Amino acid sequence: AITLTRAFIVYVRPLLEYSTVVWSPSLVRDIDILEKVQRRFTKRLPGLQNLTYHQRLASLNLESLELRRLRSDLIFAYKLVFGLQNVNVSDFFEVRTNTRSRGHPYKLDLPTAKNRTRFNFFSYRVIRVWNALPTETVNFSSLGCFKKSLTSTYLVRFCKVYFK
């Protein structure tokens, strides 16, 4: 099972996660199609057939693809806000200048959407999550520390609180 899991992580998962910051599925059916690949893989491993999907992921030390997409969006947002990408931040969103609000001082403002399609864009997906992050998570001085703070248990708990 360990060899198959490594093969899945090396060969299959990069195909499922290719360009997720640029395009991330927003429709439930599209999310399910991508997640179904990982569900089927974990279901076929010996000894895991009778476990639930989340139990299989935990026993294999894997995360759902949805959580991995959220993490990659947050990491890219961190890179944009702190100037680690050679990209004009104002093309995506505006960093608020008002630092008197609750939470961290790097809050982002949503650009207005003229149609439903823009809600799938990176800037719309990430802003609500980014603005809700606690100060201690956003204020890390290095990207590595920020990445370490985004553990799967933290993201699961965070998503349950803010998005359910």
Task: Please name every model-derived segment.
Residues 1-164:
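Hydrophobic/basic alpha-helical segments
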